[in-house]
Amino acid sequence: MKGSRALLLVALTLFCICRMATGEDNDEFFMDFLQTLLVGTPEELYEGTLGKYNVNEDAKAAMTELKSCIDGLQPMHKAELVKLLVQVLGSQDGA
């Protein structure tokens, strides 16, 4: 549990840093980031969502560890997170 909290803190910190550093739609960035964490690969994070940032090796290692934790979730739990993401994305489209 302690490791999970640390990984969540890393993800939130990364999100906050990127959110402050960009002028793009922050919600869109965050949703793309979450979607890639749930169903993408670490490489897709660096090439896509985080592509315009210089991600150092320690941050890459942290992201890989976070992705590994997400990939280790029970399939039904991961599916529920994906459904929640789809629901949130759908509500943003209608707004």
Swiss-Prot record:
Taxonomic superkingdom: Eukaryota
Subcellular location(s) per record: Secreted
Transmembrane region(s): none
Cellular component, GO, one term: extracellular region
Entries under InterPro entries matching the protein: Secretoglobin, Secretoglobin_1C-like, Secretoglobin_sf
Disulfide bonds: none
Keywords: Secreted, Signal
Signal peptide: 1-23
Gene3D superfamilies xrefs: Secretoglobin (1.10.210.10)
Family to which this protein belongs: Belongs to the secretoglobin family.
Protein name (database record): Secretoglobin family 1C member 1
Organism (species): Homo sapiens (Human)
Name of the gene this protein is made from: SCGB1C1
